Amino acid sequence: MKQVFLLFTVLFFAATSSFASAPASFGEAKVVAKREVFFDQADGPVGDLYCGCKWQWVGKSGGRVDAESCGYEVRKQASRAERTEWEHIVPAWTFGHQRQCWQKGGRKNCVATDPVFRAMEADLYNLYPSVGEVNGDRANFNYGMASSAAPQYGQCSTRIDFSERTAEPRNEVKGLVARTTFYMFDRYNLN
């Protein structure tokens, strides 16, 4: 009986130690997300978060957007429109600006001094590849209805209302965005 218990204990620890720990930084999270989460989704049916564009992986964690695959048209920033960027569905500003580290030096200070902030910034559930231009335009705007904003990116149905500081993601990902937002607010006790 002791041998069975010992064998079970060894197998349990071997199995649990094989699970990777969470990424320690945003930079590490981007690499892990590419390698272990989104590695096979660059030409999948969902595409990037905001426009459904396919992309090609380039470098450690980035990619090149295939604008023709989704009918994307550049609004203003051609260089950002060509690349994928890692979107924080719940922006770093949202989970960081109330923290003491942010008050004393912004995001850079939080990255350097606050392990809870680093965990939130690197949380893989909150990261998704997106067209860089749309990521930049969304900035730290809340999600909501942006029905008064005209389409800005060709056939991409995500809309940004700059005057209302609101971003409305395409219908296909609204559930993903909502679930991720609920997760982040619950997991990290955000207000």
What name fits each language-model region?
Residues V74-E85, V90-N191:
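Domain-level detector of nuclease and nuclease-like folds
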Residues M1-V4:
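Positively charged n-region of N-terminal signal peptides that target proteins for export
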Residues L7-A15:
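Bacterial N-terminal signal peptides
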Residues S21-R83:
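Aromatic-lined ligand-binding clefts that engage carbohydrates, nucleic acids, or primary amines
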Residues T16-A20:
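Sec/Tat signal peptide C-region and signal peptidase I cleavage site
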